[in-house]
């Protein structure tokens, strides 16, 4: 499973990725970003509570705060949306979490390294029966986080599908939950989740 960061909950809402960019911009300027980080924490807590999970992201948010203060960069900041959502999804499904930075690679020029990624990702996926790999990011040769362009979780999904040798890759986006039809075509499609594997 390859999740994106949480998107808009309603029309005038803000995507978590945009919240993270704004939060990091303040940190990068040496300004207080506590209120912005607290809003992001609340957003994830709402998801955790909605799923009735016994999950605490305090440690992860502590690391994020420290790295923002250390000016870890926009790529790192933006990637945390997928990373945190991946932790939640893995907890909810009972799957392993595989940090994309350990299995998705870019070369020294910032270009996607398909050969290295496929080799490492295939081996890592073989160690897990079921896994969640957060979308949108990977790592540079020096270990720093690098993101794909906006919408990069779709790219990650196809990369993971190739490495896993799946027969079918399904890309579900822009809806809250799992629906039986595209809500842009069918008004109020029924939420339907009977089985996921």
What are the roles of these predicted feature ranges?
Residues 1-197:
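Nucleotide/pyrophosphate-binding catalytic subdomain
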């Amino acid at each position: 499973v390859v999740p994106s960061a949480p998107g808009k909950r309603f029309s005038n809402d803000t995507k978590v990725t945009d919240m993270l960019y704004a939060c990091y911009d303040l940190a990068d300027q040496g300004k207080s970003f506590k209120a912005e980080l607290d809003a992001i924490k609340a957003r994830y807590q709402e998801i955790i509570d909605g799923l009735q999970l016994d999950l605490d992201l305090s440690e992860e948010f502590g690391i994020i705060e420290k790295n923002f203060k250390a000016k870890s960069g926009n790529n790192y900041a933006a990637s945390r949306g997928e990373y945190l959502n991946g932790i939640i999804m893995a907890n909810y499904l009972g799957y392993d979490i595989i940090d994309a930075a350990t299995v998705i690679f870019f070369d020294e020029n910032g270009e996607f390294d398909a050969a290295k990624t496929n080799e490492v990702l295939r081996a890592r996926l073989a160690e897990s029966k079921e896994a969640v790999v957060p979308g949108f990011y990977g790592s540079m040769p020096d270990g720093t986080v690098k993101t794909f362009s906006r919408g990069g979780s779709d790219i990650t999904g196809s990369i993971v599908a190739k490495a896993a040798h799946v027969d079918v890759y399904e890309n579900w986006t822009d809806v809250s939950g799992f629906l039986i039809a595209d809500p842009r075509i069918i008004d109020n499609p029924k939420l339907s989740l009977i089985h996921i594997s």
